[in-house]
Amino acid sequence: MDLIFDIEGNGLLREVSKIWMLCAEDMNTGITYDFCDYEPGCYPLREYKDLMYEAKSVTGHFILGYDLPALEKVDGFILPKEVKVRDTLLMSQTLDYMRFGHDGHSLDRWGEYLGIPKPVHEVWTEYSEEMLHRC
C-alpha cells in the first residue's frame, strides 16, 4: 500500500500536544481514510497506526519536518524503517529551489499555482470541521 497522508494538530511541532486527525489515501486504489474522533463517519483516530503499518511508502508535504515527528511526539508512533518516505516539500525544494522565487514551497503556494487554493484555517487550539476539509 502506498499512502499519501496529512495530519492536523493543535500547534507547531514545538507546541503540539494533540493530533486532531490523520487523513490518508491509498494511491493505488484511491480509497481514502479519515481518522478523527470528532466527526461521524471517520475511523477512530487511534486506528491510524494499523493503516500506517501496512504501508510500503508514505508521501506528504513536510511530513519529515512536522507530521511524522508530531505523531512520534504526541502518540509515540514511529514509522517502520523499511517504509519509503517521500516528502514533497523537500522534493519541490530539491528539484527547483527558486520555483516560486522567495515565496517558498508551501502547500498554499502550490495551491495558488495549480488553481486549487488551500482552505484558510487560523485557530488550531480547538477542533473545527474546517480542519477535515483542509486535511
Regions found by a protein language model. Give the residues of each.
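Conserved Rossmann-like nucleotide-cofactor binding loop
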Residues: N10
